[in-house]
Structures are given as C-alpha cells and as structure tokens.
Amino acid sequence: MQALIEISDKQYLVKKGDTLFVPRQQTAIGDTMEISSMATIDGANTVLNPAVSVKAKVLGHVKDDKVVVFKKKRRKRYQSRNGHRQQMTQIEVVSL
C-alpha cells in the first residue's frame, strides 16, 4: 500500500519503511510526526481519503547539497559568487 502525502507544499508518494528528506520541520529527533494523507493507493485501487494519517519518525536534521549562485556582468569587472545550503529533515515512514 502506498500513500500520497503533502509536507510544506511538496507531495511525496511513500510506503512503509521509506526514508526521505523533506524541508526542515520543527520537531525533535526521535519524535513521531502525524501527516494527513491525500490519497491511498492499493494495487489498482486509488482512494482519495483525507481521514487516513501517516506516521513518520524523525531521524535527523541535515543540510542539503550546496547550490552555487554566480552572477557576472561582462566588461564591468563585476562578479558575485554565493552559496546556499537548505535545511532538511530526514524522516522514516513507520505506518500507513
């Protein structure tokens, strides 16, 4: 069985035992999150049921890979290089 969930305006298709990285959540490491499901998929049957909830355990808070932003104006001796690392939360789906 799979479920379609939404966390911070992003949608994920998950099943039991999946680990995924989501945008930073304000929960402590080791806590369990309750996430409402948008749809459940069981084989060929799809049920749109917002009453179903997914439980996920928070494994840790990490930073994503660095994204480099480079700006340049030719012939003007202007260059700007900045880096950014997005804060992420790693979760594991415990039950559907």
From Swiss-Prot:
Q: Which GO terms describe its cellular component?
A: cytoplasm; ribonucleoprotein complex; ribosome
Q: Does the keyword Ribosomal protein apply?
A: yes
SUPFAM superfamilies attached here?
Answer: L21p-like
Give start-end positions of Polar residues composition bias.
85-96
Indicate the transmembrane segments per the record. none
Q: Name the keywords, alphabetized.
A: Ribonucleoprotein, Ribosomal protein, RNA-binding, rRNA-binding
What InterPro entries does the record point to?
A: bL21-like, bL21-like_sf, Ribosomal_bL21, Ribosomal_bL21_CS
A Gene Ontology biological process annotation? translation
Biased segments, Basic residues type: 73-84
Keyword check for RNA-binding: yes
Alphabetically, the GO molecular function entries are: rRNA binding; structural constituent of ribosome
Q: Which PROSITE patterns match?
A: RIBOSOMAL_L21
Positions of the UniProt region annotated as Disordered: 73-96
Its subunit composition reads:
Part of the 50S ribosomal subunit. Contacts protein L20.
Question: Could you tell me what this protein does?
Answer: This protein binds to 23S rRNA in the presence of protein L20.
* Family of this protein: Belongs to the bacterial ribosomal protein bL21 family.
Q: Which NCBIfam families match?
A: L21
- Name listed for the protein in its UniProt record: Large ribosomal subunit protein bL21
Task: Give the organism, scientific name.
Answer: Chlorobium luteolum (strain DSM 273 / BCRC 81028 / 2530) (Pelodictyon luteolum)
Lineage here is: Bacteria, Pseudomonadati, Chlorobiota, Chlorobiia, Chlorobiales
